Regions:
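N-terminal beta-loop-helix "entrance" segment that forms/cooperates
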Residues: 32-55
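Short amphipathic alpha-helical segment that frequently serves as the phosphate-/nucleotide-binding helix
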Residues: 18-23, 48, 77-80
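Helix-loop-strand module that forms the ligand-binding subsite of alpha/beta enzymes
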Residues: 50-133
Length: 200
């Protein structure tokens, strides 16, 4: 599987966890990294044809970004507006990304317990990420379970470095696609009638 990581940090060199993740991913086989801030420059202008060609040569697309104001930094939105165009990603003939996977790799400043009803952010991260999920669905992509590191505002260096292993494990999880996990569970139920009876 060919993986394309679109890094959308406004200043990757000054980043903490995103830079650590990029360093780890850069030494991983079959992974291509594109720094959108560097490519788009200060005007955030992209060569749509070149970016679309990069998407088409990969199977899994990863949006990597720090979670700012409950969304992504402006550079990713600019990239999406210019690259995921009518006739390419949606609309008549816009099925070029059909079957490809989209995964979000993000870090939040707030702790995990702040992202739920009753927490100070009120909603789960999954709820905040619905626009990205719908983007994937509109483009006929498979939206995979995101990897989220919470609590960057107070994270220690050792915690940041320790996040690399679970991050890489997440990206290589064969059951990231819920359809794959569901198929396995159904097969297990078919093979074990007693288990099927227990959950009915």
């Amino acid at each position: 599987m060919q993986i394309l990581v679109l890094a959308a940090h406004p200043n990757l060199e000054r980043s903490q966890i995103n830079r650590v993740w990029i360093n780890a991913l850069s030494s991983t086989a079959d992974v291509t990294i594109r720094n959108l801030t560097e490519i788009g420059g200060p005007t955030m202008q992209f060569d749509a044809a070149a970016e679309q060609a990069a998407l088409l040569s990969h199977d899994r697309i990863i949006f990597q970004f720090p979670f700012y104001w409950y969304s992504a930094p402006p550079v990713l939105k600019s990239w999406m507006d210019q690259v995921l165009t009518y006739g390419f990603a949606y609309g008549p003939g816009g099925d070029k990304l059909s079957g490809r996977e989209l995964l979000l790799l993000i870090s939040t400043g707030g702790p995990a317990d702040s992202y739920h009803a009753g927490g100070y952010n009120n909603f789960s991260v999954d709820e905040f990420l619905k626009p990205f999920q719908q983007t994937a669905l509109l483009a006929q992509m498979r939206y995979l379970r995101p990897f989220v590191f919470h609590g960057m505002a107070q994270a220690r260096t050792d915690e940041i470095e320790a996040s690399v292993v679970p991050m890489l494990q997440h990206l290589s999880d064969p059951e990231l696609d819920p359809a794959v996990r569901q198929a396995r569970l159904l097969k297990e139920l078919e093979a074990n009638p007693e288990l099927a009876a227990a959950v009915s």
